[in-house]
């Protein structure tokens, strides 16, 4: 979304993040190494990201779509941007899920257990079709970072990823030793905090 807002490639966007397990927040935004945090958060709070998401969705009823309703709201309330999509963030804030009017206002899409079972069956069958040669194996790079992590731990070359580690100063407002989710360095000796990535409340 940030790359669309700033009309640039995803690789030109860098962020700092901080939070607790799976509930992390973008604290700083950079485009081509220029700090655009204030502008980015202002534009998000003004609804730009939500408008883009709704336009992209264009009537799509897929319950797995994120339309930026909750993220926009929370950015306005707290001054930071939730890093995960609405569907994941709302799991930490059940009040939004319980209230049907709030779900509708923010376009929070919930999924039934039956739909999850259907998706699981489809997602299990697809690799089987690939193994049987009935469907080509995708060759484009996945957005998942596990291959980079495995390669770093095998080769010893550093890979910087978002990880859960004991706080060693990455989040200055939280107690040392508390498990926090921030950028960390992974290599042959494991995962450790990145001393260059620290965040605190503004």
Give residue spans per PLM region.
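Long, compositionally biased stretches enriched for glycine and/or charged residues
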Residues: 3-202
């Amino acid at each position: 979304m940030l790359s669309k807002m700033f009309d640039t490639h995803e690789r030109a966007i860098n962020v700092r993040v901080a939070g607790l397990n799976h509930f992390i927040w973008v604290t700083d935004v950079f485009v081509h190494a220029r700090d655009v945090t204030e502008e980015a958060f202002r534009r998000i709070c003004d609804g730009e990201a939500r408008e883009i998401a709704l336009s992209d969705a264009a009537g799509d009823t897929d319950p797995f779509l994120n339309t930026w309703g909750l993220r926009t709201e929370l950015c306005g309330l707290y001054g930071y941007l939730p890093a995960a999509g609405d569907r994941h963030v709302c799991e930490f804030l059940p009040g939004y899920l319980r209230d049907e009017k709030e779900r509708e206002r923010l376009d929070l899409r919930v999924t039934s257990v039956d739909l999850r079972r259907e998706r699981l069956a489809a997602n299990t069958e697809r690799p089987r079709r690939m193994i049987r040669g009935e469907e080509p194996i995708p060759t484009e790079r996945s957005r998942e970072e596990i291959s980079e992590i495995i390669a770093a731990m095998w080769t010893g070359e550093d890979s910087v990823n978002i990880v859960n580690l004991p706080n060693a100063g990455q989040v200055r407002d939280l107690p040392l030793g508390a498990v926090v989710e921030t950028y960390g360095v992974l290599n042959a000796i494991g995962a450790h905090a990145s001393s260059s990535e620290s965040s605190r409340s503004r």
